[in-house]
Amino acid sequence: MTQQAYEALLNDVAAALDIERVETDKSGGFVLELDGSRWVSVAYSTPEDKLMCQLCLEATLSPDAETLRYLLRQNQFIAEYEQQHFFSLIPDIQQHNNIVVALLRLPVHNMTPKIFLQEVDRMVSRGTAVESWLLQLKEQKEAAPAAIEQAALKA
């Protein structure tokens, strides 16, 4: 994705999320103005950071969760998130969009997969409706191997 296309995508996302302004920063990344006083960085200094930003932005514009899963599978770095967490379990568009908004509000600058997942865990522990739903998905995903093992023992 070219810098110009990336900036156009960010502006589309900004309009969709009622973000007031998008600006380029010194690092070549971007910051989003949410309410005139609070800025959220989507700057990146590594290819991984850039991919995380791009995932959030593309997912926001995706028509459904299946598209998000497709995007996740296109890149090995991002696929690690799917394997470790909740992306493959997103059931509908509204929950999907709520999660993407939450992800966009994370400062992804210099985040490794481990740090990103720790930050998601911290969000989940605060207990809002979307975050509680994420926790439920995480628990379901963690319980899945045990359920498969039990089913295999019964067979």
Model-derived regions, located:
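A short acidic-to-branched-hydrophobic micro-motif
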Residues: 40-61
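Charged, low-complexity, helix/coiled-coil-prone segments
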Residues: 7-22, 55-73, 147
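Hydrophobic residues embedded in beta-strands of well-ordered beta-sheets
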Residues: 30, 49-51, 98-100
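Ampiphathic alpha-helical segments that act as solvent-exposed interaction surfaces
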Residues: 70-79, 105-139
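Short, highly charged C-terminal tails/helix-capping segments
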Residues: 135-155
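A generic beta-sheet turn/junction motif
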Residues: 34-35, 46-48, 95
